[in-house]
Amino acid sequence: TKNSLYEGGIRMPFIVRYPKKIKAGQVNNESVLCAVDLYPTLCSIAGIKTEKGYQGDGQNYDKVLLGKSKAKRKTDLMWDFGRNQFFKKPGNANDRSPHLAIRSGNWKLLINGDGSDAQLYDIAKDKFEKNDVAQSHPEIVAKLGEKVCKWFEENKDKGKE
């Protein structure tokens, strides 16, 4: 369901067509990009400098979109889903995720802001998130949980205006 932070809710295809620069028919299923990466990436491809002082969270993946390399994220991705009228939906509890998630390399942790309901997945081996390995990797749960919960606390009041 798209109303969750499971891969089915946040993973989506991204299709780029730019005949003068991108060879048709290329597929990249390995690189992990996010919407915040689009601004610096598209500016770079278009030869446009980002505005002076720009400090967005996105990374420039121009070489990935141009088919010249695979991407390895330099920063973790974090999500917060739950500050709107759709939280607690869908009605099927099995489709509901905790409201925070962090992706760090192949690891993805879902957790609530109070530290409850931690679920850890190795996305490279388990892209459908069927095998929660949180019990086997408490150190990763602790590290990523602390990071995403701190991020949430620092940002939870932003975007309400």
Task: Enumerate the language-model features and the residues they cover.
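Histidine-centered active-site microenvironments of extracellular/periplasmic hydrolases
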Residues: T1-K21
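C-terminal cap/loop subdomain of S1 sulfatases and analogous C-terminal strand-loop tails that border
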Residues: K2-L5, I22-S31, V36-I123, E154-K160
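A general alpha-helix detector
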Residues: T41, E129-D132
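Hydrophobic packing residues in well-ordered alpha-helices of helical domains and bundles
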Residues: I102, V141-L144
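Intrinsically disordered, low-complexity polar regions and short flexible loop motifs
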Residues: D126
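Active-site-proximal N-terminal segment of extracellular/periplasmic enzymes that hydrolyze or transfer
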Residues: N131-E139
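Short amphipathic alpha-helical coiled-coil/interface segments
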Residues: H137, L144-V148
